[in-house]
Amino acid sequence: MLLNVKACLVYTAPQECDALLQVEPTTDGGQRCDNPRLLLLSGSTLRLVEGEESIGMRRWITVSNRLDCIFEAQVDVRRVAANLDELQETPRYQLPSAVLQYLMTSRYCQSDLFLDFTASQFAGLSGGALVRSMSDWVKSNFTYDIFTSNPGTTATDSFSSLRGVCRDYAHVLIALVRAMGIPARFVSAYAPGVRPQDFHAVVEVFLDGDWHLVDPTGMATPSDIVRVCVGRDAADASFLTSYGALNLQEQSVQVERVST
C-alpha cells in the first residue's frame, strides 16, 4: 500500500531548550520511506541519532522561541499480516537478549499490577490467540475519548476509567500481554484510518520469533501502519520530547492512501 504522510508541528518556547524530534518513518523489511522531506521553518538541527533498537532516527533540535516544522514523505507498506491465532509463544529462555526488556514492567505499563486480572479473564489461552483476545477486550471495553488522559496517564489509570486515546489503548494492551509473559512494545506510527487524524500508537508482540503489529483501537491494520519508532512505552517513543517548556500552538497529521 502506498501512502502519503504529512505532519505539521508548531510550538512556542518561553526560553531556549533542546528537543528530540522523531517523525520520520523507518525503512525496514515491511515498509520503505521514499522522498522524506523535513522542513524546519524555525528551530535548528544539532545532531541525528538512532532510535530505540536502531529503528528510525531521532533528531536533536534546539528551539529558541518557536518550533515550526513540516514533514512529508511517501511510504510503501509491503507488510503482510500474520494470522495471530496461528502464532505460538517463543519459549522465554529462547528470547533474544534485546527482547527481554519488553517482558518487564515500565513507567506507563505496570504489568505486575495486572497479573490477577489476566490470569482470570484470559485463562486457557496462549500465544497469538491470547493476544487477539486481549486486544479485542480492550477495543470492546474502552471508549475512545480525547479529553480523558494526559501525558502522565498510565495503563492502570486507563484501565480504571476504560477511556483514552490510542496511546492509552496501547499501554493497557502492553501491560496485559507482558503480565502473561509475552514480550510487547510500544510503536509510534501513522495510519490512514485514524479518526480524528493524528499521530498514532499501536503495539508489537513477539511471537514465533518475530515482532507482529496489533492495533487495539481497530483503526489500523498491519498492512497500512507506517512505523516510526519503538520503545517500552510512550516514554521511549514519543514524536517530540522537550527538555524545557514547549507550548503547543498547532499540530496536524494527514495520511492518505495513494494505491493499494
Predicted features, each with a name:
Residues C33-L41, R47-G51, R66-D68, S97-Y102, ...:
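Short, surface-exposed, polar/charged, turn-prone segments marking secondary-structure boundaries
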Residues Q31, S44-L46, Y93-L95, T221-V230:
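Short, surface-exposed linear segments at secondary-structure transitions and domain or protein termini
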Residues D136, D168-A245, Q249-S252:
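Hydrophobic/aromatic-rich core segments of domains that either
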Residues M1-L84:
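Intrinsically disordered, low-complexity N-terminal segments that are enriched in acidic
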Residues T62-V63, V77, Y144-I146, S161, ...:
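Generic structural "secondary-structure junction" signal
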Residues A13, V75-R79, Y93-G164, V172, ...:
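Secondary-structure boundary elements
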Residues E24-T26, D85-Q94, T217-T221, Y243-A245:
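Short intrinsically disordered coil segments
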Residues Q22-R32, Q88-P91, D157-R163, R167-A170, ...:
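Short low-complexity stretches enriched in small and charged residues
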